[in-house]
């Protein structure tokens, strides 16, 4: 599959541009998450779904949106996720990225209730060995998006560890 990158397509519309420098890894990842999450919300409200996509905090402090495309109209989400991860690893190895965010739609068991729910997952990785997946359980009814209890778990540390 050929990897193509679409950079700065959605977030420039949202007015996201430059990150503060010298912040702790968790703070930089939270800032990146806050930058990428609105696009998932927008797509869910508009289309009821979204393809996996991502964002990266560049070493320059700029935030870039990133999408994976292999030429197919509706590739499986796992294929898109793999393309995005390949690009993230390449950016990590080259030193271009200091943090990445992979956003995708999943079904999860909410820890507090034990019930299954749709959720927006945001997998965050930072070059300073910080990795977490944040889950935003949601319910979508008639275009209205309602969040449940947000929770997180340790991430896979699969982007920057691959150096």
Describe each PLM feature range.
Residues 94-163:
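Low-complexity intrinsically disordered segments
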Residues 5, 20-84:
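N-terminal domain-onset segments
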Residues 65-109:
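Mature extracytoplasmic domains of secretory-pathway proteins
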Residues 11, 39, 50-51, 69, ...:
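Phenylalanine-focused residue identity feature
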Residues 7-13:
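Bacterial N-terminal signal peptides
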């Amino acid at each position: 599959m050929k990897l193509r990158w679409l950079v700065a397509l959605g977030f420039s519309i949202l007015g996201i541009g430059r990150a503060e420098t010298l912040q702790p890894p968790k703070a930089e990842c939270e800032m990146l998450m806050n930058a990428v999450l609105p696009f998932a919300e927008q797509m869910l409200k508009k289309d009821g779904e979204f393809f996996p996509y991502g964002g990266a905090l560049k070493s320059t402090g700029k935030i870039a949106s990133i999408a994976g495309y292999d030429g197919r109209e509706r590739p499986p989400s796992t294929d898109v996720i793999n393309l995005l991860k390949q690009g993230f690893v390449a950016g990590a190895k080259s030193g271009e990225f200091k943090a990445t965010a992979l956003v995708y739609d999943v079904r999860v068991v909410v820890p507090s209730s034990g019930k299954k729910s749709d959720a927006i997952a945001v997998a965050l990785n930072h070059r300073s060995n910080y990795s977490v997946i944040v889950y935003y359980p949601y319910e979508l009814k008639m275009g209205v998006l309602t969040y449940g209890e947000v929770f997180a778990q340790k991430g896979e540390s699969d982007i920057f560890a691959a150096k």
